[in-house]
Amino acid sequence: SSAASDVYKRQGNTIVQYDWTDIAKLDYGNADMRAAMAAAMRFWLDRGIDGFRCDMACEVPIDFWQQTLPALRKEYPGIYLLAEGEAPALHDGAFDASYAWELHHLLNDIAQGRKSAADLRAYVARDAAAMPREAFRLMFTSNHDENSWAGTEFERMGDAARVMALLTFTLPNGQPLVYTGQEMGFDHRFEFFEKDPVPAWERNGFTDFYAALIRLRHENPALAAGERGGQAAYPLGERTPDGLMLFSRTAGGNEVTVAANLSAEEVAFDLPFEGSRREFFTGKEYTGGTRTVLPAWQWLVFAQDLSLIHISEP
């Protein structure tokens, strides 16, 4: 093709970014290339897909997304657009959701004893201030990159893996990601470039755990993503013990309170509510104001107006 219509950046040969030798760098300065990219997206939307996860979205000029995605929304109302990146500008007229990478690495650090619940509270405030209120933040303990290159959640988080998963379902503005195999506690690093079949699916305690998390989220408006959900309040304030992440979210007449021990030591605290409430996972009744002890990496969840369910231990 001619230089004017070439969709690739070249210096003699096509330019390759990083060591991605199978991916030539596109020329986003070429209007014809941009139009071709939009046409390719329409091709798949015409076939009924729900939307796109855009890989390395921050490596593409923001103005391309801001030019292309609103036009697609007009033609295909209700599409879902996820950016693999977390620059606030990605939400400026472009994406619905972005990856909460900083949170992911923070959860790893807390599990490994390098960071604390106080660091998590600071993150929640910082992210809420940086991101638009309507932004969905994709939260995860594993994904295809982290599993293959950094290890499974069990390698990185050990005994903290489940409480960290709970946080991805309950923290403000979050939209949880469950990676292949997590729903059955599959402790295996998938080969990134080679065939590595997923084993036969078997229901177990992890399946019940994730099913409970999904039900908790779906039946509680307070846990909705973006502007529909509640922001974090900290009922114990400065009386919150080190190691404890205790927060409440309220929306639509619904309240969810999460108490998570993010340390390798037990933690004691007073339940910050009046009257009695049933804990979501166990169905056990707790009286507000009473002294409670949480073992290492354990949690309590109190959801208002939600019928209790019981799950088996993994």
Residue ranges of model-derived segments:
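Chitinase-like catalytic core of GlcNAc-active glycosidases
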Residues: N13-M37
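Active-site-proximal helices and loops of the catalytic beta/alpha 8
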Residues: A40-R42, D50-F140, L167-T170, G185-R215, ...
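Active-site clefts of carbohydrate-active enzymes
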Residues: R133-R156
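Glycan-recognition and catalytic regions of carbohydrate-active enzymes
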Residues: Y179, D187-V256
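Surface-exposed beta-strand/loop patches in extracellular or lumenal glycoproteins
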Residues: L262-E274
